[in-house]
Amino acid sequence: MSNPEFQVVPIAEEHIEGFHAAVDSVARQRRYLAMLEAPPLEESAEFVRNNIRKGHPQFVALAGGRVVAWCDIVPERRETLAHGGVLGIGVLESHRGYVIGPALLRAALAQAKIAGFKRIELTVREDNLRAKALYELAGFVTEGIKRKAALFDGKYYDLVLMSLLL
């Protein structure tokens, strides 16, 4: 398969349904996200609108006009932690293994720095070696392990806590 052409753009209202469908597709693989399906469309729409309204970094990758990946960074809710953001990212299975993930990550991290974030953190399943390698290449470091933190289909998985200081 050849490297698909794609474009990384800030998310807009017109991308909400595609974003929701992409999240649902990745979630249903039961491996990459901490959910088994996307939240209701209305909840996804409010998440996106809130990110747009508040200027939180959220980007999508478009291929053939369709959302094939996303990356967002939202601030921690508590005032004492709000200088830090939590990163979420996903790529449709059909578009993995190219440069989409790194391109999205670069865009979101650059915007996070402009927005004044000082720390970005994430959790990743310990067996998701490709994602861990991507994060390490971007400068994330492991801070710890949450043992048996995720349960998928009756099996427990450790989650790796990673962070990047901006």
Question: For the regions a protein language model found, what residue spans apply to each?
Answer:
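Short amphipathic helical patch at the helix-1/turn junction of helix-turn-helix
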Residues: 91, 125-126
